[in-house]
């Protein structure tokens, strides 16, 4: 009887007939009871994992310097898995942390009906959680065409502009985005492949003005596991799977290859590299900011700096010793002119340095993002391209 009962619980491969077994009366019922118990155990493990994730995220929120009880914080929710997980966990932490949580959704109007469906999905979830929803809209395609920039830049500027608007109006104090450790690794790797310096290795910053990123210590798959445990649906943006996009290829092909063939901890190591680089970049950034205030003259929509001050910041004569500070100073100037520092790679910085050393008066150098550099005798002038 015991042997027959044991074999009755074996799972046989799909497509293969299981053998006929004659079980004693009551064995089927007992087998179902065991199945129910196993299912309950699995469900409990899922709930335990979900509770542990909520505990970890709440603890991470509480450790941040910007945290305080009563904080009004909005979760930026696109409808995708990561942002839905952020919203659910932020909602779960409300009572424990004493925060005022809300949802923030920005409709880019890029995917027609799908964009509107995303908005409706987020609205329904926010309502079910008892959270206020703040919605912004923009025709990002028209904005990109008008400003002569790509869709990604236009979308980011419109979206973050909306976040700043909410903060300036006092609707929220901070907006939390759902960038994960995987996003950090992808960003650092993308910068390395493009060519970058220490600022690029720093990757995604945990806080930038009114925007915070509390999930940078968490893996993307853990967030999906959390959602599955909560039986929570999410929306998928088809553009994230578009293999024509570099970021999508990196996510689907390159990083999995590196994890499988070289180091299963590559994502964690890239994220750790960004932490170390950020510490050093912050020091260099502070020095460059002081240099910029002292040596850069703003006027007429442009920024002017002497060639000597650019090539030898702080009077450092050695090219290699001054290289990091010089690169950050160029980044600082370009940011002042166009607010799009990210488009300037290490190769572009080298081009500016070469132009400063060899360029003739009246000559121009074009940089990406609509920035030109004009040589005026012993100075360089950075200005927006007309």
Provide a role label for each language-model segment:
Residues 5-15, 19-82, 102-106, 138-140, ...:
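AMP-forming adenylation/ATP pyrophosphatase catalytic core
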Residues 94, 129, 262, 334-338:
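A broad structural signal for alpha-helix termini and local helix breaks/kinks
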Residues 23, 28, 32-255:
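Core alpha/beta nucleotide-donor-binding catalytic domains of modification enzymes
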Residues 256-266:
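Conserved anion/nucleotide-ligand pocket segment
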Residues 237-241, 264-267, 342-343:
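Short, surface-exposed loop/turn segments at secondary-structure junctions
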